[in-house]
From Swiss-Prot:
List of residues binding 1D-myo-inositol 4-phosphate: K345, T346, G352, F403, N404, K405
Keywords of the record: Behavior, Cell membrane, Cell projection, Disulfide bond, G-protein coupled receptor, Glycoprotein, Membrane, Receptor, Transducer, Transmembrane, Transmembrane helix
A single MF term (Gene Ontology): receptor-receptor interaction
Species this protein is from: Rattus norvegicus (Rat)
Description of activity control: G-protein coupled receptor activity is regulated by lipids: phosphatidylinositol 4-phosphate increases HTR1A-mediated activity.
Taxonomy of the source species: Eukaryota, Metazoa, Chordata, Craniata, Vertebrata
Motif DRY motif boundaries: 133-135
Protein name (Swiss-Prot/TrEMBL): 5-hydroxytryptamine receptor 1A
Disulfide cysteine pairs (residue numbers): C109-C187
């Protein structure tokens, strides 16, 4: 969003300078050719990467069937929104930055500001929708499976655009101050105090609060699941120890001492149906695992504990088998929890990046109209803050590509043009 101008011709009055600051502002005649070249290269690279990254996300979801689910529909819609920012907003913002002057007329300025506010607000609200979707999926996983439909995703996406329209349209209908159009060389958003509060809270501060609450509850739910899993493992381990201790003590060897070969450990065979000797075979929780249990030796003879029956009555569960089953179950739970924590971590990084990019901008956007000429903001710092917000549209696809293996594989296929060969 563009709430401040970068330069206003040869005028240097306080009301016309960037951020309403005092002192002289670099005029169009003072802008050097080297500044224009360097700025054009930097901003051109940013815009190109933003377009390419978001286009790849959209193409990946459209071409890769494994990515076509409700959660990724929200991500795809976010990419479309960021693509609109990159194509419709950033080129005009870059031209404004390079020339240090608005040269496209007042009508185009109004359209530029409306598109800027609409697309940037929708992009921010998409992050809210993604956080809300993850919150429902983690806190109500069973019921939300049936509720997580494309229709619900479409409703969330439509809501983000509706709120964006409600925030972007009012200045075009007159909710602005007369000073907003006083300088033909400047193009800034309305500095009306009421609209400033309405737009900044609607586009950023309320969504920020909502995301903080949602992610706080997501982390709390994830932590509860982890602790619950640990308690189950500990309880199962205690039960296994109790069941093992109830087994009859081992018989002594002929010399009255436990034999050196007593209570041998299990021999694990990964191939189902492999012949086993001197032991009892039982298929555990892992369908690909067979346990061979040699229990006790007396002289040259061997005695084997009976395997637990289907009903579990009058049988003893071998400790090694129970430990193996427990390890298998625990490993599966750890894998599931690791995937869940990775998802939460990824979305947390997205939210953190969003805050880093947009918080400085919205602090300035909220404070500036109220402090008038008492605020002092260097023009260069203002431009950096402005483009830091725009860069969020570049960083979103980078984060998804880095953390999501499915997206990585789809991007590789796009680069190698494997989809073209189908």
């Amino acid at each position: 969003m563009d709430v401040f101008s970068f330069g206003q011709g040869n005028n240097t009055t306080a009301s016309q300078e960037p951020f309403g600051t005092g002192g002289n502002v670099t005029s169009i005649s003072d802008v050097t050719f080297s500044y224009q070249v360097i700025t054009s290269l930097l901003l051109g690279t940013l815009i190109f990467c933003a377009v390419l990254g978001n286009a790849c996300v959209v193409a990946a979801i459209a071409l890769e069937r494994s990515l076509q689910n409700v959660a990724n529909y929200l991500i795809g819609s976010l990419a479309v929104t960021d693509l609109m920012v990159s194509v419709l907003v950033l080129p005009m913002a870059a031209l404004y930055q390079v020339l240090n002057k608005w040269t496209l007329g007042q009508v185009t300025c109004d359209l530029f500001i409306a598109l800027d506010v609409l697309c940037c607000t929708s992009s921010i609200l998409h992050l809210c929708a993604i956080a809300l979707d993850r919150y429902w999926a983690i806190t109500d996983p069973i019921d939300y499976v049936n509720k997580r439909t494309p229709r619900r995703a479409a409703a969330l996406i439509s809501l983000t655009w509706l709120i964006g329209f409600l925030i972007s349209i009012p200045p075009m209908l007159g909710w602005r101050t007369p000073e907003d159009r006083s300088d033909p060389d400047a193009c800034t958003i309305s500095k009306d105090h009421g609209y400033t509060i309405y737009s900044t809270f609607g586009a950023f501060y309320i969504p920020l609060l909502l995301m903080l609450v949602l992610y706080g509850r997501i982390f709390r739910a994830a932590r509860f699941r982890i602790r619950k899993t640990v308690r189950k493992v500990e309880k199962k381990g205690a039960g296994t120890s109790l069941g093992t201790s109830s087994a009859p003590p081992p018989k002594k060897s002929l010399n009255g001492q436990p034999g050196s070969g007593d209570w041998r450990r299990c021999a694990e065979n990964r191939a189902v149906g492999t012949p086993c000797t001197n032991g009892a075979v039982r298929q555990g929780d892992d369908e690909a695992t067979l346990e061979v249990i040699e229990v006790h030796r007396v002289g040259n003879s061997k005695e084997h504990l009976p395997l637990p029956s289907e009903s579990g009555s009058n049988s003893y569960a071998p400790a090694c088998l129970e430990r193996k089953n427990e390890r298998n179950a625990e490993a599966k739970r750890k894998m599931a929890l690791a995937r869940e924590r990775k998802t939460v971590k990824t979305l947390g990084i997205i939210m953190g990046t969003f805050i880093l990019c947009w918080l400085p901008f919205f602090i300035v956007a909220l404070v500036l109209p109220f402090c008038e000429s008492s605020c002092h903001m260097p023009a260069l710092l203002g431009a950096i803050i402005n483009w830091l917000g725009y860069s969020n549209s570049l960083l979103n696809p980078v984060i998804y590509a880095y953390f999501n293996k499915d997206f990585q594989n789809a991007f590789k296929k796009i680069i190698k043009c494997k989809f073209c060969r189908r």
